[in-house]
UniProtKB/Swiss-Prot annotation:
Gene: ankrd45
Taxonomic source organism: Danio rerio (Zebrafish)
Name by which UniProt lists this protein: Ankyrin repeat domain-containing protein 45
UniProt function note: May play a role during cell division.
Phenotype of null mutants: Ankrd45 mutants are viable and show no apparent defects. However mutant larvae developed enlarged livers when induced with liver specific expression of Kras G12V, one of the common mutations of KRAS that leads to cancer in humans.
Record has rRNA-binding as a keyword: no
Length: 224
């Protein structure tokens, strides 16, 4: 039988005891590795560890503390493919969903039914959670595309001989404009983000297409 101290992490999650959790985590990381692992990954009678329990119960501060201190993986999956994001969506814990998204939870994780968290929210009629997840995913997709384009332009080896200065400026300026739009538009909807991403893709398509073309010098060499 485990001692009360070994159960503290899970009990803190269940009781929403943030200060107690901070204390046990501080002590745990000074203990030996085996003991620390036992304390951190303890599960309840139905197999839930502290992170999943906190997500289901809406313990947002507990979730943040566990993940930021490396005591839990925000994208951990159960045997049936449920992530913390799935669990919060299923139980209608909107504030905890927002916390998980801030902590870089994966929108694309699917359970054994092939459902993302947004699908689970819809199945359980947690419509506020479904709406938020659709909005957050659309926003993240736009931000990710902007980051991808910026990374491409910054990669001298990739753009050498394919993009000229004007091409690079188009990419940089267009991405900056979209970033400003994201930061300054407080009432953007999921559809707004989807449309802005499509507009960005359309503007940059002619430039990015050049990256897939063979450099002229290379083509001449091959012909010869």
């Amino acid at each position: 039988m485990r001692s009360a101290e070994e159960k503290t992490v899970l009990l803190c999650a269940l009781d929403d005891d943030l200060e107690g959790l901070k204390g046990i985590l501080e002590r745990t990381f000074t203990d030996d590795a085996a003991q620390s692992e036992n304390i951190l990954w303890e599960k309840d009678e139905v197999g839930r560890n502290a992170l999943f329990a906190a997500c289901m119960m809406g313990r947002s501060a507990i979730v943040r503390e566990l993940v930021q201190n490396g005591a839990a993986d925000v994208n951990e999956l159960t045997a049936r493919g449920y992530s913390p994001l799935h669990c919060s969506a299923m139980w209608g814990q909107l504030d905890t969903l927002k916390t998980l998204v801030e902590l870089n939870a994966d929108f694309q994780a699917i359970n054994f039914r092939g459902e993302k968290a947004v699908d689970v929210a819809r199945r359980y009629d947690k419509l506020d959670c479904a709406e938020y997840l659709a909005w957050a995913e659309a926003k993240q997709n736009l931000q990710a595309f902007i980051q991808e384009v910026r990374a491409i332009v910054a990669d001298q080896e990739k753009v050498q001989g394919k993009l000229n200065k004007e091409d690079k400026n188009i990419c940089i300026n267009t991405c900056s404009a979209k970033s400003d739009w994201i930061n300054n538009t407080r009432t953007a909807t999921a559809q707004d983000f989807i449309e802005q991403k499509k507009l960005l893709e359309d503007v940059l398509a002619p430039v990015l297409l050049k990256l897939n073309a063979q450099p002229e010098a290379s083509m001449k060499t091959r012909k010869n």
